[in-house]
């Protein structure tokens, strides 16, 4: 019946919305930003940037794990990604506004891997996406899925040093 089909479609959509997305966030210019602020304020600057990233991802019920001083691993649901996409990844601008006397603004690169069969492949896609974001000069979000690449933000076209991009195809 039509009701059964409607109900089935609702379950399919809900299942799709709950799919996990792996992502990476890098502070593009960490060293330059740290050098541009007094030493006594460096830990505060890092804490403010950390807080912005944690709040932004936390607000969509995502998880953030700091991997290194300038690298973060994130996990979110597909419906959370839709919200970030709608607000055009406002975190990119929010982090640039963090100023406690630093003469250089911090910029971020965000890489997300979408619509994959496995979590491992989502992470591989996220790594390809972050490499592309860095190769294009940072300050942008790059989304990789099985259909291709989508870019948000980023004005500077440039090639990164020592960058090799490996194309990963789904089995």
Annotate each predicted stretch with a short phrase.
Residues 63-75, 99-128, 138-146:
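A short glycine-enriched loop-to-beta-strand structural element that forms part of the catalytic core
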Residues 163-171:
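Residue-level detector of conserved catalytic or cofactor/ligand-binding positions
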Residues 12-13, 89-92, 115-140, 158-162:
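Catalytic-core segments of nucleotide cyclases and related cyclic-nucleotide turnover enzymes
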Residues 1-39, 135, 144-160:
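Sensory coupling linkers of modular signal transduction proteins
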Residues 17-72, 76-79:
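Catalytic NTP-binding/metal-coordinating core of nucleotidyl cyclase/transferase enzymes
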Residues 50-61, 81-104, 123-132:
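Alpha-helical scaffold within the catalytic cores of cyclic-nucleotide enzymes
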Residues 45, 83, 111, 118-121, ...:
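Catalytic cores of large soluble enzymes that bind and process phosphate-bearing ligands
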Residues 80, 118, 149:
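Surface-exposed, flexible loop/turn segments at secondary-structure boundaries
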